[in-house]
A protein has these predicted regions:
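Bacterial N-terminal signal peptides
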Residues: 9-16
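Bacterial N-terminal signal peptides that target proteins for export
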Residues: 1-8
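Active-/binding-site microenvironments in catalytic and ligand-binding cores
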Residues: 22-299
Length: 299
């Protein structure tokens, strides 16, 4: 089964195109987290030594390992030498794009788009932004625990029951802006929890929070599909400042317990429609005060 090729070194930039007839962007924003790198442990590139960061690298949330950089012997010339080396990292590390072949349904008739990244055209990765801001609701829920996420939903709960997540009403509110090739960009403010040494159980990193974080649940995904069908359009994808576009609750499936069950609805239902998912975005709030037409360029 083909997996996605993660664009971990991508630049996710947005140019603001002013309203009217001009097509000259006058502002650009970068939504990528840096890729932190660490020296290998005893020369083993598969084992990062977090006590030996490259430059100002700091560990981040990840289901896999932290990235390593192993330096090769210098390539010498008469005037100096070239520095070079190897990198070793998970393809879903930091800001990256999930391609449409990342999730394949067991029912192959549901896999309408099975392309991987090298098969995409510019039309697949560039499109107008539709912006949704849920950060105030997320901050209100975090305030119940002094601004810190708790994996216990009795303390902080990022599901539809509290409203501290993406709701179908959020999608319906921007339905008029959704067109062919749109990018839905969601700002939750959750990225502030991204940096931090991983605990022994990576699921308990504050950013992952025991699969208790804001994002798209099944009803929000279904609302977006309903709007696509109603308008006869197909979006390019979704970008959000969280782990998976899906909410943590979505990842736990219909029984709320099983990450290996029937959940991950943005992946299960969206990727197979041709949506691309830009995960672990940074500082999506940069767009909060923009009133012109914005375009997302993933590359």
């Amino acid at each position: 089964m083909r997996r996605n090729t993660g664009l971990l070194a991508m630049t996710l930039s947005v140019g603001l195109i002013t309203s009217g007839c001009t097509h000259t962007p006058d502002r650009y924003y970068d939504f990528t987290h840096k890729i932190p790198l660490f020296a290998p442990t005893a020369g083993d590139i598969t084992k990062p030594d977090l006590s030996k960061p490259f430059k100002d690298s700091k560990a981040v949330a990840s289901f896999g390992f932290q990235a390593t950089r192993k330096v090769k012997d210098p390539f010498k010339t008469q005037k100096g030498f070239f520095q070079w080396g190897w990198f070793h990292f998970d393809e879903h590390y930091t800001t990256h794009l999930d391609s449409t072949d990342h999730y394949l349904n067991s029912d192959t008739s549901k896999n309408a788009d099975k392309r991987s990244i090298e098969e995409y055209t510019l039309k697949d990765i560039i499109g107008p932004i539709v912006y949704i801001d849920i950060s105030a609701r997320v901050a209100k829920e975090l305030a119940k625990n002094g601004g810190k996420p708790s994996p216990n939903p009795a303390v902080t709960n990022f599901s539809e029951s509290t409203g501290a997540t993406v709701l179908p009403s959020d999608i319906e509110r921007v339905a008029g802006q959704i067109t062919d090739r749109s990018w839905i960009v969601v700002h939750s403010g959750w990225d502030k929890h991204f940096v931090g040494d991983p605990p022994k159980d990576p699921f308990l990193h504050p950013y992952i929070n025991g699969l208790n974080y804001p994002g798209f649940g099944k009803s929000a995904v279904e609302k977006l599909i309903e709007i696509e069908n109603r308008k006869g359009v197909r979006i390019n994808g979704i970008m959000m400042d969280n782990l998976s576009i899906d909410s943590g609750k979505s990842g736990r499936g219909s029984d709320g317990k099983n990450p290996f069950g029937d959940g991950w609805y943005a992946h299960q239902l969206g990727l197979t429609r041709g949506w691309k998912l830009l995960e672990n975005a940074k500082d999506t709030g940069q767009l909060a005060n923009e009133t012109g037409k914005c375009t997302l360029i993933a590359g």
